[in-house]
Amino acid sequence: MDSRKLGELRAFVRLCKQNPGLLHTEELGFLREWVESMGGTIPPAPASTSTDETSKGKAEEQPEEPVKSPEPESEESDLEIDNEGVIEPDNDDPQEMGDENVEVTEEMMDQANEKKMEAINALSEGDLQKAVNLFTDAIKLNPCLAILYAKRASVFVKLQKPNAAIRDCDRAIKINPDSAQTYKWRGKAHRLLGHWEEAAHDLALACKLDYDEDASAMLKEVQPRAQKIAEHRRKYERKREEKEIKERMERVKKAREEHERAQREEEARRQAGGAQFGGFPGGFPGGFPGAMPGGMPGMAGMPGLNEILSDPEVLAAMQDPEVMAAFQDVAQNPANMSKYQNNPKVMSLITKLSAKFGSKP
């Protein structure tokens, strides 16, 4: 099953636990039936539910008050992380990386190794900037050796330049993705920046590739903070899922209410249209009980009424006030038909009705 759908389902179940009254809504009737068919018990509906049902008609007539959405909580509101030891990021220009496409000769490899040894000596003497410069010289001579970038990254960490260290580690991992030292120094650089989750990931991977006490000690420091951030994020993901479900249910409810309202309006229009035709059997004014010249047999029962009312020309004529007034006049006194012999609209309707019933006007 789709993991997103499972997440939404979990959020929906939590929502129902928090508010069991949701299970008594009309749109969740199918869920109640299923739970009960499986032997489950639905908590009783809140007392307000029956009251809501009895006052449903009145509520429908009143305009709905807009639902006030709760003020959004800040995602940082309840997240407190100890950021001791976190420093401002370094914004120096990117360091030299060497040409990775250069063809390295044996002589260049030897020279790079000499520069590396000089850099290590400078590092042991505490001359960090000299060590960086020498490692840079070695990298330019042999830009495809991952350990050189990792070594320079370690010096950048000591110089409190975590972004530079991360750039070196990224290049080293591109060359050799299985170097534990590279992940260790990148993890330490992320720790300096307060990137707790990234730091925990890199330090854990470093220990997995090649256990290191220094990396393990720092992992124990950063992991609780990384877990706290992850739990905080999951909490707000759950809130967002619950909010999405509530909004979806509200949209379904509004759509259903709108559909029902449209049906009621349509029914009211049909009833109003039928009422225009008075007491004539099936809807024509005045009853018109078989009194037209020629008899129009069967009018009292109007066996062909449905056919008549489905004729668009008849319906159009019925909407004409002049025609309906004449029709009412003739219905009350058939002798008055002579008054309308020269009115084509009236005579057209009478002719059509006579044809429907098999008689002549």
Curated annotation (Swiss-Prot):
Chief location category: cytoplasm
GO MF annotations, alphabetized: Hsp70 protein binding; protein dimerization activity
Keyword annotations from UniProtKB, A to Z: Chaperone, Cytoplasm, Repeat, TPR repeat
Biased composition (Gly residues): 275-292
Record field: compositional bias (Basic and acidic residues): 53-71, 254-270
A single BP term in Gene Ontology: chaperone cofactor-dependent protein refolding
Protein name: Hsc70-interacting protein
Origin species: Gallus gallus (Chicken)
Keyword Zinc-finger assigned: no
CDD domains in UniProt: Hip_N (cd14438)
Lineage, uppermost ranks: Eukaryota, Metazoa, Chordata, Craniata, Vertebrata
